[in-house]
Amino acid sequence: MLNIAVDLLWLRPKKVGGTEFYIRNLLDGFLQLEEPFRLWLLVSKDNKETFRHYTQDKRIELLETEVVSANIAGRILWNFFCQNRFLRKKGIRKCFIPVYCRPLFNGGIAYVNVIHDLQAAHYPEYHPFHEIAYSRLCWWLDAHFSRHLVAISDWVRNDVKEKYHVKSGKITTIYNPITVDKEELVSFEQLAEKYHVAENEFYYTVAQLIPHKNLHTLIAVMERIKNTDVGLPCRLLISGVNGESRDKLESQIRNRGLEREVTLTGFVENAERNALYKYCRAFLFSSVFEGFGMPPIEAMLFGTTVIATDRACVPEVTQGKANYVKDPYDVEEWIRVMQNPADRIAEMDFAQYDQMKLTRKYFELLRKYLE
């Protein structure tokens, strides 16, 4: 029987973007499995209550630590030097870590890690030196000491194989499970009152406010629409957890006189996000680097036109069925694509992101390498 720890100490609720949705979707999938298993969720003082409800299933228990996830440096040190001993004392010898971070040594514990991307390797200019050093160390440890690796797209798998010389048999691609409840919606009247938008007369995007999401280009697109007669709605809503670019984006919005046209909504709950997906003219995905990219697929599940960059994994995970901008920084190209988007959503195979299909892939992989 599968009997493993699941390291969740890295998760700072509503602070880590898509990785939080990924692991919660996966854990929700485990609840629906009929097979026997035992998951010990390794949780921190400041995230444990967000996982408490999983213990209603007798197959899942919390392993509470003294770690504070918000104290990133403290969490890393505990992860490096204390985690193995903690697990051994609990009689646990196998651990699944759904991100790249891990202890310095195995210490008698078998680990399976998930690598979501190698962002700091591709865009070091967006990260301080200590983040780059830590990321590269963990990726090297994953490649050399973890029993097996999961990549969240073929693009990431190939990237890891190339940069860390990982053999094909040691890394498996499993897409992120995507769950969208199409009935979980606030009314459009609520959106209209809150954001002063008209149905099908605004654009929407979901992205963490960090540089490689390329949101400054979308703001420039809105400025061009406002100042020229291109026949497009001049209204953009941007949802996502705060990041280092928030101040710069707010300044850009003010300096261009777009306070009425561009709104940073901050984090929004699923019901509001879903309604924004459904009622927008199109979903714009300007990111230049992604390991997977869940928001475009979520938008397409609502039948919404998606306009995205063709960088990294985005064409792969959208199955080539979105509308693509070849130069993600070219304002004029964005406008041209926005003026004449194609609708190929009916050709999408959404079963590739099915929660239970992918949960079962994880279950079988973890049984193979950790049972």
Predicted regions and their residues:
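Carbohydrate transferase catalytic cores enriched for Leloir-type hexosyltransferases
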Residues: 1-371
